[in-house]
Amino acid sequence: MSFCVLIPARLASTRLPRKVLLDVGGIPMIEQVRRRALESGAAQVVVAADHPEVVDCIRSYGGEALLTAAEHVCGTERLAEAARLLGLADDAIIVNLQGDEPGMTPALLHATAQLLLDHPQRQMATAAVPITHWDELADPHAVKLVLDAEGCARYFSRAPIPWDRSHFPLSSGQTLPQTPGIWWRHLGLYAYRNAFLQDYAAWSASPLEVIESLEQMRALERGVQIAVYCAAEAPAAGVDTAADLDRVRDLFP
């Protein structure tokens, strides 16, 4: 059994308009993302777009793309619609790769999907990297997670968790206590089984999801075990601003 990668892509981005079609290394960003997915070993890679212009772009490079509804409020809803349009089986493993992450490493995509291939009882998987400095742990834009003994997420938060009562808070620039496997930053990469994805996308927002502004909390609050692949280092961050775009372009001279 293999996996597929679906790439939700919005042309109507707010902070950086039309970013998925902006040039990165001589081709549109969304095509760079698709090429990273193709290198992951996925059996199928499909871009799920909100506009015909994105669909036409991908098809001009010989790729597979679908036009999905424009009114989806999140990428998960777009992903679920694309899976239905493709007629994917209930047990199909789907990796959700954002259309603004041309620096994603194919190995990380494969490893996250492999968690579901190796653990048939799991319905959802994600990834994380170690946090070593206080500034990152204290940053509310860096989402933290706590793992249980089975390698599944117990909680996600923008707060610095777990809180080391003996040492915290630290000063800016300080490294965290040398306790391996304690502090983790969540990476916004997910894999799902299709039947679960369809249910998950239809669930209403949960209380903790609203408080933390973290969509994955709706799964935890319903008792879903989210398997976590612990990577050694993070891929290049996604593109939200013009400064991000300049940084990513340096990776593709």
Curated annotation (Swiss-Prot):
It catalyses: 3-deoxy-alpha-D-manno-oct-2-ulosonate + CTP = CMP-3-deoxy-beta-D-manno-octulosonate + diphosphate. Pathway: Nucleotide-sugar biosynthesis; CMP-3-deoxy-D-manno-octulosonate biosynthesis; CMP-3-deoxy-D-manno-octulosonate from 3-deoxy-D-manno-octulosonate and CTP: step 1/1; Bacterial outer membrane biogenesis; lipopolysaccharide biosynthesis. It is found in: Cytoplasm. Its EC number is 2.7.7.38. Keywords: Cytoplasm, Lipopolysaccharide biosynthesis, Nucleotidyltransferase, Transferase. GO terms for biological process: CMP-keto-3-deoxy-D-manno-octulosonic acid biosynthetic process; lipopolysaccharide biosynthetic process. InterPro entries: Cytidylyl_trans, KdsB, Nucleotide-diphossugar_trans. It comes from the Bacteria. Pfam families: CTP_transf_3 (PF02348). GO terms for molecular function: 3-deoxy-manno-octulosonate cytidylyltransferase activity. GO terms for cellular component: cytosol. HAMAP family: KdsB. Belongs to the KdsB family. NCBIfam families: kdsB, PRK05450.1-5. Activates KDO (a required 8-carbon sugar) for incorporation into bacterial lipopolysaccharide in Gram-negative bacteria. This is 3-deoxy-manno-octulosonate cytidylyltransferase. It comes from Acidithiobacillus ferrooxidans (strain ATCC 23270 / DSM 14882 / CIP 104768 / NCIMB 8455) (Ferrobacillus ferrooxidans (strain ATCC 23270)). The lineage of its organism: Bacteria, Pseudomonadati, Pseudomonadota, Acidithiobacillia, Acidithiobacillales.
